[in-house]
Amino acid sequence: SVTIGGTVSPAGGNFEEPVTQATLKVVGAFHGLSRERSDARKYPSIHPIDSWSKYQGVVDMARVEEARGILRRSSEINQMMKVIGEEGTSAEDYILYQKGELLDAVYLQQNSFDPIDAACEPERQAHEFNVLYDVLTRDYALSDKKEIRAFFNQVRQEFLDWHGTVYGTPEFAAQETKLTDLYRSKVTG
């Protein structure tokens, strides 16, 4: 198997120029680096909305597309909140924004200083995504923004603690139970 990597750094970040467009037509994946994500210390600083791959992953593509849709909508809500503020955002939109932030923090970022979180085997990646997908697709009995923020921060921390456990161990299972009990306690219906 041969893997070839190439880089293109268009002047001013203009991806419409001919060399960049020609390169994008022949590659199987694109990792768009983001100054904004790097400045926010979100590593790896690969922009999750601009980046793409033609290769089959370990996670069901329909679920990936649904998660990507949540991420896009969360980004739109974030841009809207920069203009009108958090106060002008409905609780429903704020929950969707928090879901996107959760997806970004617990699945798209990693802690390279943690020997367990630095690399993830495909089975664990698929398993964790399925749990995260369940979190993302549920409706929650939350209405106050302070409560929404606190809830998603707590869920985020439980995910990050889960990332520090070895896959398949009793500690891994115990942390997963703690996480699922937490988010299911606020599920409606």
Language-model-derived ranges and their functions:
Residues 167-189:
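C-terminal non-catalytic accessory extensions
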